[in-house]
Amino acid sequence: MKTDTPSLETPQAARLRRRQLIRQLLERDKTPLAILFMAAVVGTLVGLAAVAFDKGVAWLQNQRMGALVHTADNYPLLLTVAFLCSAVLAMFGYFLVRKYAPEAGGSGIPEIEGALEDQRPVRWWRVLPVKFFGGLGTLGGGMVLGREGPTVQIGGNIGRMVLDIFRLKGDEARHTLLATGAAAGLAAAFNAPLAGILFIIEEMRPQFRYTLISIKAVFIGVIMSTIMYRIFNHEVALIDVGKLSDAPLNTQWLYLILGIIFGIFGPIFNKWVLGMQDLLHRVHGGNITKWVLMGGAIGGLCGLLGFVAPATSGGGFNLIPIATAGNFSMGMLVFIFVARVITTLLCFSSGAPGGIFAPMLALGTVLGTAFGMVVVELFPQYHLEAGTFAIAGMGALLAASIRAPLTGIILVLEMTDNYQLILPMIITGLGATLLAQFTGGKPLYSAILARTLAKQEAEQLARSKAASASENT
């Protein structure tokens, strides 16, 4: 009969085995762990920057409105002050961008996409102060712009800054921290962590290099930025529209029709944006003085509108709950929609530092509400709320314009806390995206990036020709 023999490993052999194990752990590549730790740092910094940006915009807007209160007794003076306050703030933003960091103009999201493809530079030491303070000027002046563009570009540049400061090497670290910062910026702008993650995976899918490390880093960065946002702003939904009733199954076809409407309007809106960019470029011709004065005129116009018709200016977050509640007549909704289309095109296409997410969400809400009011009149037997179409339409224009339906749906759900409307939102967003793809045309950010790269290539070619000409002489 055989018996088990006890282990005869000597203490010396055990010590040797432990040393080998420790040596293996020490020699293992620490880059993935370092990236994840840096992602937490990036997310924290981006969240703090987004909070500071949000608070700064709110403070400037309050100061601007406070200045108007002191001139309330003199109507001509009131209009003059309303124009000048917004014009000066806007000119400050335009000047910073044009003088110190042209890549900080506009949304900034195409710049991050270009950087992820190694086609655009990331000069964080210039972009961070210019985008932050320039964005404070334009958004604080009441221009029709969103804060997500600045926070996404600021976030991406913070990711690159952390990479440079801590001297992390390798393309994986550079790419991952850039994407992490961008995702954290969107999450902090809207208090929407899942939308921030989906934004990178869906909207930046051609540029984002999906690996286990990169997606974990994005998760960590988004978590930290959202925590920072909620520490200072609490855990409430960003837009309070109340709890709306669910949409019965036999009414879902109406949301598909709404999606078709947005699928037609989305590509048209994109063409208008690009066309307005060309028109405004012909106006200033690249001259910094003309460009700043043009920006001041646009900003001043928004300042006047903010006093005369507040629903037509600003990012649109204050408009969304009012429109969803049905507090506007059909005629007023049409006026607001047309006015905001014009002001959105003027502000965004002029190159002002600011995003277009929020203005498009507001446009989608207004158009969705108008459609809902028509449906309520035509089909009273369904007992529907017009507000449900406002929520469904809020993300539909986003889906049709930038071809990111999932991001639009989840963003609206997280912002409004109306998860019971997820099915009509999916139907509306999918219908809008499919028809927009069928009608052709690039997604908005891709089209803007293509223009930027073409301009960059033309400038490089011109410089090379000038250099060769000087050498020949």
Swiss-Prot record:
Against Gene3D superfamilies, the record matches this protein to: Clc chloride channel (1.10.3080.10)
Question: Which cellular components does GO assign to this protein?
Answer: plasma membrane
Q: Where is the site described as Mediates proton transfer from the outer aqueous phase to the interior of the protein found in this chain?
A: E148
Q: Which InterPro entries match?
A: Cl-channel_ClcA (IPR023861), Cl-channel_core (IPR014743), ClC (IPR001807)
Motif Selectivity filter part_1 location, chain numbering: 106-110
Q: Name one Pfam family in it.
A: Voltage_CLC
Q: Which CDD domains match?
A: EriC
- For the motif Selectivity filter part_2, give the residue ranges: 146-150
Q: MF terms per GO, please?
A: antiporter activity; voltage-gated chloride channel activity
In its UniProt entry, what is this protein called? H(+)/Cl(-) exchange transporter ClcA
Q: What keywords are assigned to this protein?
A: Antiport, Cell inner membrane, Cell membrane, Chloride, Ion transport, Membrane, Transmembrane, Transmembrane helix, Transport
Function comment? Proton-coupled chloride transporter. Functions as antiport system and exchanges two chloride ions for 1 proton. Probably acts as an electrical shunt for an outwardly-directed proton pump that is linked to amino acid decarboxylation, as part of the extreme acid resistance (XAR) response.
Hey, where's the site called Mediates proton transfer from the protein to the inner aqueous phase on this chain? Answer: E203
- What transmembrane ranges does the database entry give? 33-69, 77-100, 124-141, 148-166, 215-232, 253-281, 288-309, 330-349, 355-376, 422-438
